[in-house]
C-alpha cells in the first residue's frame, strides 16, 4: 500500500504536466511577453522620474520612430512651445506634411480628467484642427476616455502604460540584448526528396 501511495502522486503529476504542457514556441512567447511587460514597467518608472524637458524630447523621438513628422529638427521645433492656448506642439502626420496633429504632453503622476481633455479639445477647435493626441505619464479617468469616443475632432489618449509599451515596440530608450531565431523544416527544400 505504501508503494501505491507514492505512485499516485507521480501519476497525478505526470497527468497534470501533460494537461498544462505548452509547446516550446508557446513557452518562448509567454516568456517574451513577461520580459516585455517587466521592461515596460521599468521604462515607465524612468520616464516618470525624468525632467519635463526630457519627456518632451522623448515624445519627439517616439513620434518620429512611429513615422510621424519630417525631420528631427522639424519635430523638435513643433514640441515644447508652451502657452499656445492649450497646445504643446504640432507635428506632421506624415513626412510630406499633408495633415497636422496637435499635441498635449503632460508629465503627470495622477489621472487626467475630462476637464483637461475638454480644454485641449477647445484649443483644437480654436485651431480648426481635426486631430489631436494627448500624452501623459499618468492615466486617464473613465470620464476622459468616454468623452473622446464621440467627439470631433478625433483625439487619441496615450497614458503612461501605453507610452512605455510604444517605447518598447518602437525601440525608444531600450536596446536589444539577445535575439533567438526559431526555425522549422523548409518543406519546399525536401519536396523532391
Residue ranges and their predicted role:
Residues 1-193:
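Mixed-charge (Asp/Glu-Lys/Arg
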Amino acid at each position: 500500500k505504501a508503494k501505491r501511495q507514492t505512485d499516485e502522486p507521480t501519476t497525478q503529476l505526470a497527468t497534470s504536466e501533460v494537461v498544462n504542457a505548452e509547446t516550446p514556441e508557446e513557452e518562448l512567447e509567454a516568456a517574451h511577453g513577461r520580459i516585455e511587460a517587466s521592461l515596460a514597467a521599468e521604462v515607465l518608472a524612468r520616464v516618470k522620474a525624468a525632467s519635463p524637458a526630457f519627456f518632451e524630447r522623448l515624445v519627439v523621438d517616439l513620434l518620429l520612430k512611429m513615422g510621424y513628422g519630417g525631420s528631427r529638427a522639424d519635430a523638435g521645433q513643433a514640441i515644447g512651445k508652451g502657452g499656445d492656448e492649450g497646445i504643446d506642439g504640432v507635428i506632421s502626420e506624415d513626412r510630406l506634411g499633408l495633415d497636422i496633429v496637435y499635441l498635449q504632453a503632460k508629465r503627470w503622476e495622477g489621472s487626467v480628467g475630462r476637464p483637461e481633455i475638454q480644454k485641449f479639445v477647445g484649443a483644437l477647435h480654436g485651431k480648426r484642427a481635426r486631430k489631436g493626441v494627448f500624452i501623459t505619464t499618468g492615466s486617464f479617468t473613465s470620464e476622459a476616455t468616454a468623452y473622446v469616443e464621440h467627439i470631433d475632432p478625433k483625439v487619441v489618449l496615450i497614458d503612461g502604460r501605453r507610452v512605455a509599451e510604444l517605447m518598447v515596440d518602437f525601440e525608444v530608450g531600450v536596446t536589444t540584448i539577445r535575439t533567438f531565431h526559431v526555425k522549422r523544416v523548409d518543406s519546399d527544400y525536401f519536396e523532391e526528396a
